[in-house]
Design a protein with these regions (language model features):
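Membrane-embedded, hydrophobic transmembrane alpha-helices
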Residues: 1-97
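Non-cytosolic membrane-interface motifs at loop->transmembrane helix junctions
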Residues: 59-64, 245-252
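Hydrophobic core of alpha-helical transmembrane segments in multi-pass integral membrane proteins
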Residues: 64-81, 106-116, 229-233
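Loop-to-transmembrane boundary segments
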Residues: 97-110, 120
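Active-site lumenal/periplasmic loops and adjacent helix-entry segments of GT-C-fold
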Residues: 113-250
Length: 254
């Protein structure tokens, strides 16, 4: 069970994005290639989940089809990278950081870890949006369909019965990961994915800041810490019905 879960998450969140990035994005940094590959895999997933919603197709069949399509593209990317890289391996570069930069990096990482621990161990979900998204993931898993049954009554529903919640694919993405890993979709959605979502959000934000500050590492790290503080303040002002990290976790959902 544990090995299956680890293999499933590594495949979906690491191996496939790496391979698809190498296949679809050339001449860019490894980080940008990985992010591009991951979003390409999400693009294919979004198309498939809408098609299977309309046709009332099987969640498990959609999962298999997604794995085959993305796996084939990733395999091609690794094959092309290996073929192109023979005899032309780049030298490893050593990155030197000042003491101030190390301190800023440590603070940024510590705040990320704090937010992950709070989300995984201490988050109370008390809002309609999150409850509906999570129940969509669970209902899809049990009914083997894509948002075609009410998570409240169990009744069969028509196409796009509630567009706001049906079009959002992240709950179904959680259900797909549940199919692959064997872990209940509510656990995937609320406990496991935030461990990925929070660092990913900050990696993307840090990349944007790095570009904005013309690769000035110190300014980039300072900007990232200010962004983390802003997220913390927004969380404190959210209204009292939940202690979720809205700007970091909930943005993935809808």
């Amino acid at each position: 069970m544990i090995l299956r879960a680890v293999a499933a998450f590594l495949l979906v969140l690491v191996v496939i994005p790496l391979g698809m990035g190498k296949a679809l994005i050339t001449g860019e940094s490894g980080r940008l290639s990985f992010v591009g590959g991951y979003f390409a895999s999400l693009f294919i997933f979004e198309i498939l989940q809408l098609v299977f919603h309309v046709t009332m197709g099987s969640l498990r069949l959609m999962t298999l089809l997604w794995c085959l399509i993305c796996g084939a593209i990733a395999f091609f990317g690794f094959w092309r990278y290996r073929k192109k890289g023979k005899g032309n391996k780049p030298r490893a570069t050593v990155i030197y950081m000042s003491r101030a930069e190390w301190i800023l990096l440590t603070l940024a990482v510590a705040m990320i870890v704090l937010q992950i621990l709070n989300t995984v161990l201490n988050t109370y979900y008390g809002n309609w949006d999150d409850e509906t998204y999570c129940s969509n993931a669970v209902t899809a898993w049990y009914t083997d369909t894509i948002c075609r049954y009410s998570p409240h009554s169990g009744m069969k529903l028509g196409l796009f019965y509630n567009t706001r919640y049906v079009v959002a694919g992240w709950p179904i993405y959680s259900a797909m990961l549940a199919v692959l890993s064997g872990i209940h979709p509510a656990i995937v959605y609320r406990t496991i994915l935030p461990v990925f979502e929070i660092p990913a959000a900050y990696v993307i934000s840090g990349s944007l800041l790095d570009h904005f500050f013309f690769h000035d590492r110190k300014k980039t790290l300072l900007g990232l810490i200010y962004f983390q503080i802003f997220a913390l303040l927004a969380f404190e002002k959210i209204g009292g019905n939940t202690n979720e990290w809205w700007l970091i976790v909930n943005c993935w959902t809808g």
